[in-house]
Amino acid sequence: ALVVTGFYIPKAAQPAAETDGPLGALEVCMALRAIGGDAWLVSDECCAPVIRPSALGFLPDDHVLIAPNANPKGGFDAWLNGVIDLAKTEHIDTLVYIERVGPARDGSPHNMRGIDITEWTAPLSQLTLLGLHTIGVGDGGNEIGMGRVEDYAIEGVVDHGENIACTVPTDQLVVAGTSNWGAHALVCAMRALGSNAVDPYLEPTWQERVLDVIVEYGGLDGVHMTNVATVDGLEPDRYFKQVGQLTDCARS
């Protein structure tokens, strides 16, 4: 699978990728590899300073793919062609987006504050052109995958919904309180179906360790826009309680 993540926060005091997304994406990658599959983590150059070094403690170097931004356009097109070749060579059949912003009706990606962030965002929704089975995980309405519900579940429901709602659908969509929780739910589903090999990644202690690594490399809480080991403004106890509850459900 190709597992795509990275949501850049350009208006922070220290601009960087947020903590929601990379943690869940790494969990999904590790789980897929544990059950005998393979996974490549995909992001873009603005998010790379956080995501690449965080991932390299868990994945081989050639399994972390960083896209250039769309300008100059030729650079992204060449990168995309390389991924197309990789998908054919490695028989990749699934594309998973976890907290990855996508284009709204105006063709541009917007953050939850309604700001156009095209300048800092590679057009990774174009990976859907590969024709793979697609899964989207999101929490705010502006993520790739939300095109399945944008007409009736986003506009008028979230702030700036009419401007930020992503129009790109995926075959399956997971909507969660945080996208990391949605990714964790996917791995919990693997466990519930009998894949005990994913057990190490279900533990809150493993999640805490990965979150600390992401923050060490500059990851930001997406709500507070600060370099702290929290996700979407949630207190750690509340955040990891949900992780533990999902894990317990998968093992029951």
PLM feature spans:
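C-terminal functional extensions of proteins
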Residues: 141-252
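Short glycine-rich His-centered loop
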Residues: 2-17
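An acidic, phosphate/nucleotide-engaging active-site surface
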Residues: 51-128
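A short helix->loop->beta-strand "cap" motif at the edges of active sites that frequently abuts
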Residues: 37, 129-134, 142
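Short internal beta-strands
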Residues: 37-46
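Hydrophobic/aromatic beta-strand patches that form the interior of the parallel beta-sheet core
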Residues: 40, 94, 133-137
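Histidine-anchored nucleotide/phosphate-binding helix
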Residues: 15-36
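Short glycine-rich anion-binding loops that position phosphate/pyrophosphate groups of nucleotides
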Residues: 7-9, 100-103, 140-141
